[in-house]
From Swiss-Prot:
Induction: Transcriptionally regulated by FIS at 37 degrees Celsius. Subject to H-NS-mediated transcriptional repression below 32 degrees Celsius and at low pH. It holds the Pfam family HTH_18. The gene is virF. This is Virulence regulon transcriptional activator VirF. The keyword Transcription applies. SUPFAM superfamilies: Homeodomain-like. The lineage of its organism: Bacteria, Pseudomonadati, Pseudomonadota, Gammaproteobacteria, Enterobacterales.
């Protein structure tokens, strides 16, 4: 839901598929999940675990580049873990014993060295230098054990990740569960049951992929809503607008207008 009381403020629902490092360059953010709330102050760097669903309230102090993001895919996370493993010897478990937001989102105070390192990493191509620089930045987090556990959990490959990889190869296609079962050589019942164990459905995954791709198209291109709808495999623009609003809590037009100066 968008807060129209302040033109520089927006409330949005977010579900992340990649681990991200966020620099709140010219904005502050309030992140909430259930009864928990966490504030990312202007100038802070935040490490945010993937596969968490959060509500984010963003208040811009400037219309130009309010925040910057580095996205870490699974290969990068695994490389970072290989560096961290010999250094840390934590007795952690993956039991998901109700970890709170402060065990999934980690903050660094505004420090010139950390910000300079973030900016440097953002421009680096994939390689050893980038991996070691990321490990260096992550090592600045005070709760090292919780961070290591968070990264380890985020780097695991789930069954739903396999399905995402298949769908993302052709987002325009009108996917059915039978297409996935054929790709994976599994019965539809087996696919459903494995997704149920992750508390997901095929339709949820499909919606996640489409809405994430729609947001990227709105931000990174001059595509009209009708074009975006078609490019993500939804034939009806009005249906796309409704689903986007339900997913993000804001219409595609308002989403674009708020972010167009980013």
């Amino acid at each position: 839901m968008m807060d129209m009381g302040h033109k520089n403020k927006i409330d949005i629902k977010v579900r992340l598929h990649n681990y991200i490092i966020l620099y709140a360059k010219r904005c502050s953010m309030t992140v909430s999940s259930g009864n928990e709330t966490l504030t990312i102050d202007e100038g802070q760097i935040a490490f945010i675990e993937r596969n968490i669903q959060i509500n984010v309230s963003i208040k811009k102090s400037d219309s130009i580049n309010p925040f910057e993001i580095i996205s870490l895919d699974r290969n990068l996370l695994l490389s970072i873990i290989r560096i961290m493993e010999p250094i840390y010897s934590f007795q952690h478990s993956y039991s998901e014993e109700k970890r709170g937001l402060n065990k999934k989102i980690f903050l660094l105070s505004e420090e010139e060295v950390s910000i300079d390192l973030f900016k440097s990493i953002k421009e680096m191509p994939f390689g050893k230098r980038k991996i070691y620089s990321l490990a260096c930045l992550l090592s600045a987090v005070s709760d090292e054990e919780a961070l290591y556990t968070s990264i380890s959990i985020a780097s695991s490959l789930s069954f739903s990740d396999q399905i995402r990889k298949i769908v993302e190869k052709n987002i325009e296609k009108r996917w059915r569960l039978s297409d996935i079962s054929n790709n994976l050589n599994l019965s539809e019942i087996a696919v459903r049951k494995r997704l149920e164990s992750e508390k997901l459905t095929f339709q949820q995954i499909l919606l996640d992929i489409r809405m994430h791709h729609a947001a990227k198209l709105l931000l990174n291109s001059q595509s009209y809503i009708n074009d975006v709808s078609r490019l993500i495999g939804i034939s009806s623009p009005s249906y796309f607008i409704r689903k986007f609003n339900e997913y993000y809590g804001i219409t595609p037009k308002k989403f674009y207008l708020y972010h167009k100066k980013f």
